[in-house]
């Protein structure tokens, strides 16, 4: 360990007992490797392999026109440099992509009209632009329209053949109906299935079913061939009145004789009636030399004839293949003198007559009828002809354009059916179909097993590259049609490839995929862990996958093959449970898309260091021991019997039979679960919540790595890209808050710059509005090794993931404030900003060109006081650093409005004052309700050709200065390095020429050289030719580097000064970023790492919190009743170990203070060596040791890896070492009375997270606001600034109270009585508090609805009704 490192690193005490052999793969490798393989940006020697983008082009090209007079061929593709880099794309809201150029060759043929022979007439090659291809950033994400997105990998059913049954659900008898399904990568599905009558049917693409024999006829077999393919035959020979049948012991094994079996030759009984033919009997019969048995006519009846019996002379068919032998048929065959009868070997026990029965019910008997049937099923209503039917059948399964099994499908099919076709054979063959039907019939006969579709050998992963490949292929196929049409319609001799191609469909397919595919998701950027997890997610949903509604229980369940491949813990709660999974820590995806996990090889009971990655299919045949199996020093397995897994079963075997062993105990779980210490002591449901809630932890203002970690923290911080790792070794040259400059000391390649500049992100907004800010960890002059962490990011500390804070917890009730998982906090937590986070909100405003004239961004806004404009500059845009509150103006904007007719008063005012301000209205951007914060950034975008305002110019100047500084620093280091090398070459030489004033043949020394300006050193000429060429090469390279630097600077400046690409109609756009500081408050959700979540109920003054004897107050009080029923005991063990860590920290702190006081290192070294293992402190100098001690003053960090961590005894040892009680319980005193509580309380440090569910984002109040158009009721929800719903049950409550007037105003003036609510408002303004409720608008809606149904409903008041009744008096004689 380098001494320099200690200053920016904490040494963790490691509890793991099991040595890990395999290196954990990079956590975002899944994404990067897949996309790199798809793009293959750099063309290797000898051209690109046929995969990824290359294979897409190869599969679509060449394209020929309809007359085959021209051919458009694909030659190669190249990518140009992207127009903007990642940061520029983020800022400008554009897609990070590189232009794709494809070289195409157009060949035009001359066709001889008589012979039809072709000769090449003309060949033209051209590079064609095919749209932009999005590039992946270094962190495995894509920038689409300025936002970071992730393409989630999809789990789908592997192509190949699957055998299954309906579990007895289809038929009432509960009979198992077997089915086989051939699933291609693309093309028609083929199902072969049994029905309840044991007839075998076939379906194509889930359409109507046909007898399987029709498919076999279509493949070119006839009835006899079908039977001979599926059945063996037995020849019966006439022997007097009886028949002779060959004796075959294998065939008759297990056969129970109903009558005596008699040897046909000797006539003796070889097996008596009622006995079973077992292996011993069979052997004895064989030894006697029995070749034939005697069979009576009765034995033949019910058997089936194996081939057509034909009278050779007349051609008359006596019996057809497959006919059942009846007494009548047997007699007629005897009559014509048939002496040998070939019979199908069907015994109805081991071999069933299914195919023969199917053949019997099939009305087709020849190829033509079968093809017609298939055609009618696939294209109902079209009249078939033999040609169309043949072409259609061929295109279904045998045409590589339409049908593709893929390499995976072929490999799976070969494995399942014991075939040996090469994996380049991507279409179906006749043999494949026959093998499938055979295997299915064998299943029905009880041979073989059905497949488990949830086995990970039958599910594969489609990552970014493959998803993108399929999408791009679709785009190219759309394009192909257009190209063909265009080739036929233009004069082919004069056009170039460019004129034939319209790349829009291809570009649109890519855009559609990244913009709106279900698998292209807005990246979860809450914290570094959520980013990593999102990139490692596996979804069974999405196009070509399952849907939530259809997915059953089995698909969602944990399967034995998930071990080490998919995490059994981390999955969402709710409707997606089990459909969205996470890749396990050591898992990787192989070239076929199957998930592999590593194992160590075990040879003769000795564990080797050889690591093998195996997929679920390969693993099935081995005995696999667990990572914690007992071993001695020589790595020999010590147990008499070792617990192993094999093919999903757990068994015990002798050590010498073990083949493999797990590489690590944590290979079973995902990254998030591997971050939970004492995971093994938590219930699975709570572990699931713990994994999921860590992803919602908000980055805090001060990150604090956990006292009790698992050792995974550094890995996540590094691989997520949150913390910055050094790209090359070197020396730190400059450091400030926004960038680090490192001089690469080991760079030998002269073409690469000798300097690395790392830009740190400062207060950038993440996708979830959390704050991304990085801070340097290195000092000037420090040496840095490649891969070392040089800057911390959000939620990282000293290069370790730090999602929350270590707080002092007491497990005890406190006045009911921690009832039902509520959390009681101390005021110290708020005062010291322990759980304070910064959130950055983004607001944007656009100035458009409207019909009435352009909108304008300005400070000059009508009817706004100077006070309201105090934060705006002269351009009308808010200053950086201004503190703003709800309702404040951020950007002043005015919009022209149409001339409205003026009232006389207005005309008078106009005449007097000449006021012209009335024709614009104020449409400024204001701070929305509930937001208060500080402006941290403002960005101004202008359209091309629109003059930039003051503010835009200032921002541009600042940016150019920054770029110039970067260029100057690189130039300085380049100069320093080059001239140092030049001086080394020149010193000691005697040049024959030099700068002005140099006397030749003087031997150069450093003093002489330094008299001349550095730029003149190149003028020295030495005699040695070799050295002279070296100097010239050095100068050339120096000039080139200088030129490159300047060019890069000018390009960036040009991009800055160029206008921005804005949406149509937008002249100018301003984005304002407001940083909001959120302290913790009641209503915020917090959680530990063990699924122990709760809501803050109260924040108590520090003096009222329970305290220890030494006066230390608890920070947080949790309810002890939250532990037993939830069974997440890990939190208690974590608390104990955290308590020990803090105690040890106090001891180390005293020793460090003693060292600083009297410079005696011995006590500190003794203290540190007692805590850490010798390897952890190896090679530390005294200063480094003191620095390491200083870093652990607050607590000695521990690492307890999952399933391999601290045991109870280890925790007790640590507690004793820290001088604490072994029970980790302490006497606590009540903060309010000062009296001790009557029993000891568990107290210690627990790692708590503040989750993204903040009360500030949810709380909301409205007085007046927007109303729904139709019902006129207030809208709902915070986003719409809506009201509170007063629903049916609330109405019942008021009815129950008898609060009639309150109820009336709730349902009228406070809701949708339009006239009434206006009157109430006016009354309140007048200071009057009486009002009258009118008719709610929803009543009018109801009346309109009824009228639309043809019911004439009218609303009349009771007074009008009375008047109407009075008018209609009954006539006097009505009573008579």
Curated annotation (Swiss-Prot):
tRNA processing is among the record's keywords: no
Chain's role: DNA-dependent RNA polymerase catalyzes the transcription of DNA into RNA using the four ribonucleoside triphosphates as substrates.
Subunit comment: The RNAP catalytic core consists of 2 alpha, 1 beta, 1 beta' and 1 omega subunit. When a sigma factor is associated with the core the holoenzyme is formed, which can initiate transcription.
EC class name: transferase
Keyword Transcription belongs to the record: yes
UniProt-recorded name of the protein: DNA-directed RNA polymerase subunit beta
Lineage top rank: taxon: Bacteria
Family: Belongs to the RNA polymerase beta chain family.
GO biological process, one term: DNA-templated transcription
E.C. number(s) listed in UniProt: 2.7.7.6
GO cellular component: DNA-directed RNA polymerase complex
Known catalytic reactions: RNA(n) + a ribonucleoside 5'-triphosphate = RNA(n+1) + diphosphate
Keywords: DNA-directed RNA polymerase, Nucleotidyltransferase, Transcription, Transferase
GO MF annotation list: DNA binding; DNA-directed RNA polymerase activity; ribonucleoside binding
């Amino acid at each position: 360990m380098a001494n320099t490192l200690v200053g920016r690193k904490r040494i963790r005490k490691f509890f793991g007992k099991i040595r890990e052999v395999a290196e954990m793969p990079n956590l975002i490798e899944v994404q990067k490797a897949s996309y790199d393989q798809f793009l293959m940006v750099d063309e290797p020697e000898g051209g690109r392999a046929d995969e990824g983008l290359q294979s897409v082009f190869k599969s679509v090209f060449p394209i020929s026109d309809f007359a085959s007079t021209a051919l458009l061929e694909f030659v190669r593709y190249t990518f140009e440099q992207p127009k903007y880099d990642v940061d520029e794309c983020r800022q400008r809201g554009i897609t990070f992509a590189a232009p794709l150029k494809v070289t195409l060759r157009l060949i035009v043929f001359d066709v001889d009209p008589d012979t039809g022979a072709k000769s090449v007439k003309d060949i033209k090659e051209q590079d064609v632009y095919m749209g932009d291809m999005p590039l992946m950033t270094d962190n495995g994400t894509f920038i689409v329209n300025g936002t970071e997105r992730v393409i989630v990998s999809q789990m789908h059913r592997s192509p190949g053949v699957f055998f299954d049954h309906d579990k007895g659900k289809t038929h009432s008898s509960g009979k198992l109906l077997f089915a086989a399904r051939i699933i291609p990568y693309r093309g028609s599905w083929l199902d072969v299935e049994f029905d309840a009558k044991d007839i075998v049917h076939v379906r194509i693409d889930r359409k109507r079913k046909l007898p399987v024999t029709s498919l076999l006829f279509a493949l070119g077999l006839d009835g006899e061939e079908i039977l001979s393919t599926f059945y063996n035959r037995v020849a019966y020979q006439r022997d007097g009145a009886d028949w002779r049948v060959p004796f075959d012991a294998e065939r008759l094994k297990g056969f129970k004789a109903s009558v005596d079996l008699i040897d046909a030759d000797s006539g003796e009984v070889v097996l008596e009636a009622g006995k079973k033919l077992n292996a011993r009997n069979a052997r004895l019969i064989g030894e006697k030399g029995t070749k034939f048995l005697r069979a009576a006519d009765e034995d033949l009846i019910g058997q089936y004839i194996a081939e057509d019996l034909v009278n050779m002379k007349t051609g008359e068919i006596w019996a057809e293949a497959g006919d059942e032998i009846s007494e009548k048929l047997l007699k007629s065959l005897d009559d014509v003198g048939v002496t040998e009868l070939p019979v199908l070997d069907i015994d109805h026990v081991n071999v069933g007559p299914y195919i023969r029965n199917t053949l019997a019910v099939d009305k087709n008997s020849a190829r033509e009828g079968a093809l017609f049937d298939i055609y009618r099923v696939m294209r109902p209503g079209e009249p078939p002809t033999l040609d169309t039917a043949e072409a259609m059948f061929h295109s279904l399964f045998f045409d590589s354009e339409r049908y593709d099994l893929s390499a995976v499908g072929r490999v799976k099919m070969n494995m399942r059916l014991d075939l040996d076709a090469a994996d380049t054979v991507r279409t179906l063959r006749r043999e494949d179909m026959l093998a499938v039907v055979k295997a299915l019939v064998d299943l029905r006969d009880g041979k073989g097993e059905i497949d488990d579709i949830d086995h990970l050998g039958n599910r594969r992963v489609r990552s970014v590259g493959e998803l993108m490949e399929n999408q791009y292929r679709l785009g190219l196929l759309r394009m192909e049609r257009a190209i063909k049409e265009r080739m036929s319609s233009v004069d082919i001799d004069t056009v170039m490839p460019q004129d034939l191609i319209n790349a829009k469909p291809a570009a649109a397919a890519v855009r559609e995929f990244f913009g709106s595919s279900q698998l292209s998701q807005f990246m979860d950027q809450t914290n570094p862990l959520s980013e990593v997890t999102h990139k490692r997610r596996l979804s069974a949903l999405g196009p070509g996958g399952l849907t939530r509604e259809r997915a059953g229980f089995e698909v969602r369940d944990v399967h034995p093959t998930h071990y080490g491949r998919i995490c059994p813990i981390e999955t969402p709660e709710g409707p997606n449970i089990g459909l969205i999974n996470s890749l396990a820590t050591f898992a990787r995806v192989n070239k076929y898309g199957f998930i592999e996990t590593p194992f160590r090889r075990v040879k003769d009971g000795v564990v080797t260091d050889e690591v093998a990655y195996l997929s679920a299919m390969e693993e099935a045949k081995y005995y696999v021991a667990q990572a914690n199996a007992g071993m001695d020093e020589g790595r020999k397995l010590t147990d008499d019997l070792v617990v192993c897994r094999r093919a999903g079963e757990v068994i015990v075997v002798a050590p010498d039979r073990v083949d493999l062993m797990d590489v690590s105990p944590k290979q079973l779980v995902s990254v998030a679960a591997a971050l939970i210490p004492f995971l093994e002591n938590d219930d699975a449901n709570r572990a699931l919540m713990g994994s999921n809630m860590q992803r919602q932890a908000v980055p805090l203002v001060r990150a604090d790595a956990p006292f009790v970690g698992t050792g995974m923290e550094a890995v996540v911080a590094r691989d997520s890209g949150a913390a910055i790792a050094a790209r090359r070794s070197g020396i730190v040259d400059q450091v400030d808050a926004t960038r680090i400059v490192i001089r690469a000391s080991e760079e030998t390649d002269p073409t690469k710059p000798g300097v690395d500049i790392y830009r740190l992100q400062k207060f950038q907004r993440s996708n979830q509005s959390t704050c991304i800010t990085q801070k340097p960890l290195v000092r000037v002059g420090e040496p840095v090794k490649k891969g070392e962490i040089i800057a911390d990011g959000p939620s990282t500390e000293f290069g370790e993931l730090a999602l929350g804070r270590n707080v002092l917890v007491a497990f005890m009730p406190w006045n009911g404030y921690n009832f039902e998982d509520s959390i009681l906090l101390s005021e110290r937590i708020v005062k010291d900003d322990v759980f304070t986070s910064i959130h950055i909100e983004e607001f944007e405003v656009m100035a458009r060109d409207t019909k009435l004239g352009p909108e304008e961004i300005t400070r000059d806004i009508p009817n706004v006081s100077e006070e309201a404009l105090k934060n705006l500059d002269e351009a009308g845009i808010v200053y950086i650093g201004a503190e703003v509150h709800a309702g404040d103006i951020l950007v002043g904007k005015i919009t022209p409005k149409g001339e409205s007719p003026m009232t006389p008063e207005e005309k008078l005012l106009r005449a007097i004052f000449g006021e012209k301000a009335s024709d614009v209205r104020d449409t400024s951007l204001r701070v929305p309700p509930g937001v208060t914060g500080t402006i941290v950034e403002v960005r101004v975008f202008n359209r091309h050709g629109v003059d930039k305002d003051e503010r835009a110019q200032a921002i541009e100047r600042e940016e150019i200065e920054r770029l110039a500084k970067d260029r100057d620093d690189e130039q300085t280091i380049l100069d320093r390095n080059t001239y140092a090398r030049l001086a080394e070459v020149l010193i000691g030489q005697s040049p024959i020429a030099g700068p002005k004033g140099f006397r030749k043949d003087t031997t150069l020394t450093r003093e002489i050289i330094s008299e001349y300006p550095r730029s003149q050193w190149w003028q020295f000429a030495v005699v040695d030719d070799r050295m002279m060429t070296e100097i010239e090469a050095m100068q050339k390279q120096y000039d080139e580097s200088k030129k490159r630097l300047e060019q890069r600077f000018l390009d960036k400046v040009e991009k800055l000064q160029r206008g921005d690409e804005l949406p149509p109609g937008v002249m100018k756009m301003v984005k304002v970023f407001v940083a909001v500081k959120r302290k913790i408050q009641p209503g915020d959700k917090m959680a530990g790492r063990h699924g122990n979540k709760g809501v803050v109920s109260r924040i108590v003054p520090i003096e009222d919190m329970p305290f220890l004897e030494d006066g230390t107050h608890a920070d947080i009080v949790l309810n002890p009743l939250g532990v037993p029923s939830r069974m997440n005991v890990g939190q208690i063990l974590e608390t104990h170990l955290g308590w020990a860590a803090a105690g040890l920290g106090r001891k180390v702190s005293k020793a460090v203070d003693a060292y600083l006081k009297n410079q005696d290192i011995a006590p500190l070294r003794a203290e540190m060596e007692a805590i850490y293992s010798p390897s952890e402190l190896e090679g530390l100098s005294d200063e480094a040791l003191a620095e390491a001690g200083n870093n652990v003053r607050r607590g000695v960090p521990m690492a307890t890896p999952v399933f391999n961590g601290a045991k109870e005894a280890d925790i007790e040892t640590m507690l004793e070492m820290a001088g604490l009680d072994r029970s980790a319980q302490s006497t606590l005193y009540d903060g309010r009375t000062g009296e001790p509580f009557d029993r000891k309380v568990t107290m210690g440090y627990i790692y708590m997270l503040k989750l993204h569910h903040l009360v500030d984002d949810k709380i909301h109040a409205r007085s007046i606001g927007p109303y729904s158009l139709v019902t006129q009721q207030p809208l709902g929800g915070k986003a719409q600034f809506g009201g509170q719903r007063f629903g049916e049950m609330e109405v019942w409550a008021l009815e129950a109270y008898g609060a009639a007037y309150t109820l009336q105003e709730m349902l009228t003036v406070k809701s949708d009585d339009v006239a009434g609510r206006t009157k109430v408002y006016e009354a309140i303004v007048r200071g009057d508090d009486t009002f009258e409720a009118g008719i709610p608008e929803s009543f009018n809606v109801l009346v309109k609805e009824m009228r639309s149904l043809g019911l004439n409903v009218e609303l009349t008041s009771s007074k009008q009704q009375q008047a109407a009744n009075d008018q209609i008096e009954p006539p006097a004689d009505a009573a008579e």
